[in-house]
Structures are given as C-alpha cells and as structure tokens.
Amino acid sequence: MANEQCIAQLGGWEGYEVAQIGQEYREGGRWCVIRLEPSQGLERCCSSCGQLTTSIHDREDRRVRDLPIFEVPVELIVPRLRLLCARCGPKLESLGWLEPYARSTRRLADSVARLCKVLPIGQVADLYGLAWSTVKSIDCRYLERELGPVDLRGVRIIGMDEFAIRKGHCYATVVVDLSCKRVLWVGRGHGREDVRRFFELLGPEGCQQIQAVAMDMNGAYAQEVRAQCPQADIVYDLFHVVAKYAREVIDRVRNQEVARAREQHPQHRLLKSDRWLLLRNAHNLSPPQHIRLQELLATNRTLMKVYVLRDDLKTLWDYRHAGYAEQFWRQWYRRAIASRVKPLQLFAKRLKPYLPGILSHCRFQLHTSLIEGINNKIKVIKRMAYGFRDDDYFFLKIRAAFPGN
C-alpha cells in the first residue's frame, strides 16, 4: 500500500487515489498500468457551471495516457464520473489534470507541446508512442490556447510579404507589426482579395490608424492598402529594388556580354564564372575578390555602367529629406536613360511609377529585412515538419514563433 500512496503523491491526480499498479506486455514492450479510484467524501466540481456536489450519476472507466516512468509508458484507468448537478443535471466532473474527453493528461499534453517547439511531430510521436495525428491535435490545441485571438489594438506600422507554402506557385501572405516584431496575420494567397481578409479583421478604425506599410513591389498589396488605408504611406525597401535590379539588369547584361565574348576565350570565361562578384556588395568582398571584380569591370564597359549605377541607386535610401532624394533620383534616371543599355533603360522606366513609395522611406525608415528573416524561419519550420497538410496549424506555428518583443 505504501507504493500506491507514493505513486499517488508523485502523480498528483487530485481527487483520486491509486487502487492498483500493474504491468501489461504489449507489442513494443512493457507498460505500466495504474488504476485510479475516486477519493471518498469529496465534493466534486460540475464542468458546466462549476457548482460543487457529492452526488454521482454514473461512472465509466477510461484509459488515459500519462508521462512515462523511467521510459516505461504509463496508462491510467480513470473512472470518469458524471455528477448529478442541481443546476445542470448529469454533467462530467471537471478535473484540473485531465480535460473532458481527453485521452492524455494535461501534463503529458504540455510536455508534447513543449517538444513540438523544437522537434518535428513525427519524432515527438515516436518518443511518446503516440499517433502522429494525436500529437498534432495536442500541439494545435496548445497553440490555440496560448496564442488566443490576435490583439490588433495600437497597430500603426506594418510590413507585408509573401512566402511559398509548397512548390507549384502556391503562396501565402504574412503581415508583421514592425514596431514589435510580431506576426499579426498569415493567410493563403497573395492577391488583393486574399490580403483583404486582414484589413477586414483589422476593422475600419484599425485601418485608419495605420501610418505606413512596408512591402515589395507587389501591385496587389499596394492597391489594397490604398483602398483600405488611403492615409497610409507605402514604403518600398532597398532589398527588393536591388534584387529586382540584379535580375532584370545585371543578369541580362551579363548574359548578353557573355554571348558577345564567346570568341574571346579569356574574357568569356571571366564573364561566365564571376556572376556572384557582380551581385555581392563591394564591402563584403575580400581583397583578392575585390581585385578580381575590378579586372572584370575593366574588361567590359557596359558591365561597369550597370554596376556603378546600381551602387548609386542604393544611396537613394540614405536620404532623409524627400526633396533632396527626388533631385538625386532625377539625376540617376537621366544617367540610366543616357546609358544606352536597354535592360537598364527599361528598368528605370518601370521603377519610375514606384518613386512615391521609395521617397516614403525618407519619412519612415522601414525595410522588410525583418520579414525576410521571418520568411527564412518559416522555411525552417516547414522543413522540420517535412511540410504541413493543415494551413491553420502551419499558420499557428508561425504566429507562435514570432509572438513579439
């Protein structure tokens, strides 16, 4: 009897005593089976209204998983009581250590949820001998309870970006409160109708409080922000503009020059093999790499033009006065058009309509590097789980990873 009392004290099954401890041999190994019995003479709590009563309507044995003991799986046989509540009639007893209709104790569920923060669901399921779907359900309920509805009060400055859910051009949008690094909303799609759901959740008053929105040059995002938050400044950040410049100007010019230099073997080899030198920032290059870059630019005047104009374009984001920034832009635009490099001319003409959003950076020094970091973490979350079959659960995991400062 001393063993049962000791186990009961360690187990902490409030309102119940250990009646029997046994072993069962099942496929996969040995199990510890603990039978519990209700403690006599206790008032018990109605799960509906919270009223205390000693009247019991009926009971039904239920097998419930608990944490392992010395790596031996533990199963409890728990008589679940239906109380005869004076207010509600027959209702299930409320227990602090076991949720209604649950097949695992709160203690085991909390342990599973903590491990799911750092391990894939499959590994947690193998560790505790649970089904994959059981672990996923436990973690999902835990996240819903911990996160609750998102608090959108006081949101002023946000960032929006898209990320790939899976291959095949399947995207979702993440919205972040840039002031506190908190994910506010995640939803499937990256069109106007898709992001409109966030603004509907924000409500008319919340939309009026938005001061600035940082984004890439996604036309759908900009159109919806102008429709829902006409007072807000749209801010285009340096990262996406330079990345677009690299794709549409540097890569195309380099490919053209590679094709032209096929007959000149040394120059052709240099142009073809050193693409990454043109794309990296000069201050990130080592001295030998810097020398190699200078040699590359010296061999091709066209590449020199687009490289210099790219670095000059970056300085546009250093200005804090919109008037000076606009003056610099006009000078840069004239040089780009006068360069007679067609990809560069086309890029400058396409970038011109986005100038108001670029100049907004003078007022709001925002960028989406935080969101890009979040997107990288999203890739890690997705890779750990080998993909997600459930969008709602995936989006909860993203919110949990970025609760804010």
Give the residues covered by each predicted segment.
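Acidic/histidine-rich catalytic cores and adjacent linkers
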Residues: E43, S48, T54, K167-H169, ...
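Inter-helix linker motif
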Residues: Q231-R247
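Short, conserved DNA-binding cores of transcription-related domains
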Residues: M1-P90, S94
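Conserved phosphate-handling catalytic cores of large alpha/beta enzymes
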Residues: R247-Q267
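Conserved N-terminal glycine/acidic-rich loop preference
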Residues: I210-D216, Y245-E248, N255
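Short, positively charged, Gly/Tyr-enriched micro-motifs
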Residues: G50, R63-H169, C207-Q208, A214, ...
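Basic, low-complexity intrinsically disordered segments
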Residues: R63, L84, C140-G159, F163-L178, ...
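The DNA-recognition helices of helix-turn-helix-type DNA-binding domains
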Residues: T53, A131, Y142-E146, M217, ...
